[in-house]
Amino acid sequence: MAWVHGRVQGVGFRYTTQHEATRLGLTGYARNLDDGSVEVLACGEAEQVEKLIAWLKAGGPRSAHVEKVLTEPHSPTEDYQDFRIRY
């Protein structure tokens, strides 16, 4: 689980995160939170999850401005079949 803070809403952040996660073979979701951050849940091989986290920390899409990424290990209670954008 990751929370991405900065200018990450209204800039295509969830869409490009979905694309990158799918490219890495991950499942889960990305959703906007009321505080202006984006929550990302990524499930899959640990190495691929780490690659997504590194991508998030590197700033994600060019249109975004990531200030910080907070992460926390998470054991999902759902079995995600793909990576989706949640609303």
UniProtKB/Swiss-Prot annotation:
It is an enzyme of class 3 (hydrolase). GO terms for molecular function: acylphosphatase activity. InterPro entries: Acylphosphatase (IPR020456), Acylphosphatase-like_dom (IPR001792), Acylphosphatase-like_dom_sf (IPR036046), Acylphosphatase_bac (IPR028627), Acylphosphatase_CS (IPR017968). Pfam families: Acylphosphatase. The keyword Oxidoreductase does not apply. PROSITE patterns: ACYLPHOSPHATASE_1, ACYLPHOSPHATASE_2, ACYLPHOSPHATASE_3. The keyword Hydrolase applies. It catalyses: an acyl phosphate + H2O = a carboxylate + phosphate + H(+). Keywords: Hydrolase. Its EC number is 3.6.1.7. The active site is at R14, N32. Residues 1-87 form the Acylphosphatase-like domain. NCBIfam families: PRK14426.1 (NF011000). Belongs to the acylphosphatase family. This is Acylphosphatase. It comes from Cronobacter sakazakii (strain ATCC BAA-894).
